[in-house]
Amino acid sequence: SMIEQGWDVAIGHGNGPQVGFILRRSELSRHELHEVPLDFCGADTQGAIGYMLQQNLYNEFRKRGLDKQAVTVVTQVLVDRNDQAFQNPSKPIGSFMDQAEALHRREAEGWDVAEDAGRGWRRVVASPLPVRVVERDSVKDLIDRGMVVITVGGGGIPVVETEEGNLQGVAAVIDKDYASSLLATSIEADLFLISTAVEKVALNYGKPDQQWIAQMTAAEARRHMEAGHFAPGSMKPKIQAILWFLERGGKEAIITNPENIERALSGETGTRIIP
């Protein structure tokens, strides 16, 4: 519906479960095949999920008689090699292991491992902040030509610059909301829309005094975030991503669920956040 209304759209997406599946297949077959590096997992999922989105968009455009095309850009996102996240890897990935296997993988392969909430041991990797979308100019050019662009999938493939200025993949995971925020800023988007599992943002979510929010300013959103209303790993990174977008010149942002995007654009529902 956004595209029918004339919006030029760039689409980001997550890839957590899909990367998990690749890692699991890789672990199960490691006695016969080399394991897939984490940055390659990101690239693989960008291609596969991008293909699915492209195909479904093609079919929907055809159904609606729209003269539009969708294209996927395998997207690298630069991170700072000195980001403190690399000194404190905390993002669990892959399967659970017992302590003996975890310590063996640490010694043999240099993995960082940690016990995960008493359920076993897992590999942990850094989750650094995104600095620059490497393919930004290509994404912007495609949007300007009327393409629907699928990009920064899974937060983008994390890369660092070597001393020579070359790019090199790293074993890390970038938050998809943070990467999408950076992209929205860098292409000077008019609107940053986050599609999630709830129709609106709420204070005291899931409690008897839950309160849905139709609109709030950036200052109000920050105050609510600092008061602990938004859960880490859930709504909090979405609010933080929007705050960064608005602080860097963005005009407005919306949070809603997929089935209500059209109504949210017309102001009927969703949570609108403004500077």
Please provide the spans of the model-predicted regions.
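C-terminal catalytic "cap/lid" subdomain
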Residues: 1-275
